[in-house]
């Protein structure tokens, strides 16, 4: 079953002689359950591609479909909702709020989306991540891996 389809994706930054091509007609299909790695030299477009897939950086042209849904075929409001509810990214450099504990950092996006926190799911996530004993710790009290 097709999970991700990218068709002729292009991304340009700047204009004229200062224009930089970050993505040049990238096409890719990933089936559900398939594991892929995106590798390349620094500046080769890896982060730009991932940001485009996640709906964070709008491509110059081309299409991205996640679970059959056209990521950029929706208005900005629906794209923001889609991003919050359907996409997850783990950055190399995390952006945790230093004054919030583990539980507060995990639940903040749900609360900002005006939804109720599912306590059972929260406890499952904490167990899966091995953070049950550290759920009230601040980010600076966690290892780098735990922060991710």
Positions of predicted regions on the chain:
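ABC family nucleotide-binding domain
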Residues: 2-148
